[in-house]
Amino acid sequence: MAKYIKYLSAILAIVLLSSCVKDELNPNSQVIDSSVKQNEFDEWLSENYVLPYNIEFIYRMEYIESDMNYYLVPAEYDKSVQIAKLMIHLCLEAYDEVTGSKEFIKTYFPKMIHLIGSAAYRNNGTMVLGTAEGGLKITLYMINSLKLEADYLNEYYFHTMHHEFAHILHQTKPYSSDFEMISGSDYVKDTWNDVYKTDEAAWQAGFITPYGSSEANEDFVELLSTYITSTPKFWSDMLTAAGKTGSAIISQKFDIVYNYMKNTWKIDLDDLRDSILRRQGEIDQLNLDTI
């Protein structure tokens, strides 16, 4: 998919758009300069991203890589260091752990991660959390608002990362066509944020998130990314809140997601979730501020 977005009120979007034009560039933000010298962080990225995973991690905002339809601010250096370390611990190494090596990520994960400091707001009241382009590049926004809290990290960064990666996996090896038939004509395309105002409303209709109701591929990856970043209690409570009809639909679709990952990629989503949740509990133990 091209863009993963989160619904916000139109009023909030207008206020933020009107105020951001007055902001001055933070001196800690990084804009690309072709003559810039490699620093300690660049060397660390080479050792921890390029060499083991063949992933280019771009924290200096490159205009050629940025969406010029939005007013964007570069990512701050300190926040870039933090998210780079968190991404390895909470995402890349979790897959390494359950697959037994770095080869899975090296082969299938996008080859470029691009950071943007600010959010990207649309005129219709939605906010872009991340974008993916052809399975080769993921752009993450709101880096300057980074908070070291698991729920916040999942909502604004890692749910998006797993969502976009899941797209690459199903585009590489398709899932069963039976999945799309379950909700069939219930998908609402671009009107999802008008049709489902709350998660609970989407659950009761058989969708794990309002955005998952847009079309089958989004439904598939939303199920996967929500499951592996959520606690078993959340999942159980969600199914209860979904009611008899909604929970049956969600469970039927998730069985296909689970078996697809197990049989096609040899990844048990329960094991992956356990690894991610355990690693989330280790955030306070990480040295995120120094290279």
Please give the residue ranges for each predicted region.
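Acidic/polar, low-complexity intrinsically disordered N-terminal segments immediately downstream
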Residues: 20-99, 247-291
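Surface-exposed patches in mature extracellular/periplasmic domains of secreted proteins
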Residues: 95-113, 172-173, 177, 234-242, ...
